[in-house]
């Protein structure tokens, strides 16, 4: 599992290069849409899965971190209509460790859908200094969130990912729970 910030990815690759063997399966849990490709370029002979974590709602106040939900790792190959041996091995490992996980048939759309949510909420939160709760209850900020997410949907069309209404609605469902 690679779980670092995107700007730390190259350093993490350098750190693990001598630890990765021919049967190592790599599972990145970074936000965004490029980590899998970067890792696959670095480890050409290894299976690198798509991955992300959701329902991470940790809040830090002072020196205390509170997590109220159980996070879920979503992962898999690009297409998981039939799970590969590697995906099944990782699923069994996570299940044995009692780590919540899901494998979706189309992991590329799953990663892009989370990226759409992050682009919408995180960017608007950064420029407005508003919490997600404030954003949810401020129509002007929600309009900005929607515009940012629509831009991701447009980019997805150009990249032949084709996020659609179902992806949009799943993100709206998440926003409504904030």
Question: Which role fits each region the language model picked out?
Answer:
Residues 57, 110-111, 172-173:
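Short secondary-structure capping/turn micro-motifs that flank functional sites
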